[in-house]
Structures are given as structure tokens and as C-alpha cells.
Amino acid sequence: MLARLPAPLHRLVLKVAHSLRLAWWSVRRPELHGCNVIAADPQGRVLLVRHSYQSPEKWMLPGGGMARGERAEDAACRELLEEAGCRLVEAKCFAVEVVGLAGASNHIHLVSGVTAEEPRPDCREILAAEFFAIDALPDAITQTARARIAWWAAQNPAQNRAS
């Protein structure tokens, strides 16, 4: 349904919905489960995205909420396809972080994998999606994304070397 809206109106709806969701979480304080995806291309670069509704000037890892009973790897594959138009293979959950988010307890499942596809963001939810070399991440990246990539890279030195 939202896809029928003009892109600027769609982005406005996403911003309002995100604000309402954060307000609701501050009241309800739910336990949430989501994923962040570290998708590397064959050259070892990682995919980052810029959301239209949350800090659009910042680069972040792709990801999103997990449905009840959904495996982290399946959620990561779904989110990467939705946000960047890329298929993730060799998906593996390598850690779970619990962080506070607007009063909610947010369990972030960190999933890594490989994609050989060029990103195709919809320019609605996702304004941009690009691959970056680990040693040349953009200045405008969130600290959380930078830390998660560094942690993953330290554990997977062979996987993130340029060919």
C-alpha cells in the first residue's frame, strides 16, 4: 500500500511511524529482537545503507526487526533483500548484543554473509546503499556500525581482505 504513495510522502510516513514506534516502546518497554547484517562482497567490502527516516546523513548496517519465531539468518536475508535488493548467502549469526532502545530491551542478532549483487535501494526507506572497504569506511558512519564491523573484521581476517 505504501508503495503507491509518492516517494516524498512515503518517507514522511516512515519518519512519523518511526517516532510513534519509539514513543510506544518508551511506554510499553518491550523485548525486541532484530538483526544487523554485515554483508561482504567478493572484494571484502561491507555494505552500508542510509535510512530515510532515521539519521539520514549517517551510514548504518542494514537490518531490521525479526518476526516471532524467525531465525536471525532468515531475517537478515529478508532485510538485506528488502533494503538493498541483494541476496545474502552463507548467512551466519555470530553474536547477539542486548541494547536499550527508547525503553525497550533490544536483542540485536549480528549476522554476516556474502553478496555478489550490486545494491539497488528503493530511495524510499533506504536513500543509499554502497559497499565500502573496511579500511575506508565513511566518516558519517554510526559508531555502532563502525564498532560491529571492527569486531567482525577482527574475527574474520581472511574473509575481509580484498582479492
Describe each PLM feature range.
Residues 39-40, 48, 113, 131:
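Conserved hydrophobic "DFG−1" position in protein kinase catalytic cores
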Residues 1-36:
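Acidic, metal-coordinating catalytic segment for phosphate/diphosphate chemistry
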Residues 87-95:
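A short coil-to-beta-strand element that immediately follows conserved catalytic motifs
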Residues 41, 45-82:
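Conserved Nudix-box catalytic region and its N-terminal flanking loop in Nudix hydrolases
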Residues 97-120, 130, 148:
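Active-site-adjacent beta-strand/loop module that shapes the phosphate/pyrophosphate-binding cleft
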Residues 121-153:
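NUDIX/MutT-family hydrolases
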Residues 150-163:
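Charged phosphate-binding loop/patch that engages nucleotide di/tri-phosphates or the phosphate backbone
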